[in-house]
Amino acid sequence: MNHRVQPIIAVLIALGAFGFLYVLVTNPGEMAKMAVTVIVAGIIIYFIVKYVMNRNAGSEGAAFKKAAKQSRRRMKEQKAKHRAGHKGRVSHLRSVPSASKPKPMILKKKSQTQLTVIEGKKNKKKNRALF
């Protein structure tokens, strides 16, 4: 990318670097104090923003958390069923002759996916002239 730095931005960066070096050389204690102040202010702002964002999420955030929890629980149950069905099986890498007759194939029932109905404009007629 050939983006050219604006002259005003370059001057501000140069002045900031010069001021940083000047304070670092002349008064390093004050520099450390300013750094701690900036870090503490940043942490306070971060937690305020995080708190406000969590409050604004409201019912949508709660619904999402509930759906995620249900999904995790359902996946654990499916994995437990899957593992229980495969415990007695022999790996496909080993060839073990079977003494008994082969078992009939069991058809696995597909699990229903959880779908959400989105309400919309169902009665609106399509303009067939555009097709």
UniProtKB/Swiss-Prot annotation:
It comes from the Bacteria. Residues 66-92, 122-131 have a biased composition (Basic residues). The chain crosses the membrane at residues 5-25, 34-54. Residues 62-131 are annotated as: Disordered. Its main location: membrane. GO terms for cellular component: plasma membrane. Disulfide bonds: none annotated. Keywords: Cell membrane, Membrane, Transmembrane, Transmembrane helix. It is found in: Cell membrane. Coiled coil: none annotated. It is a multi-pass membrane protein. InterPro entries: SA1362/YqhP-like. This is Uncharacterized protein YqhP. It comes from Bacillus subtilis (strain 168). The gene is yqhP.
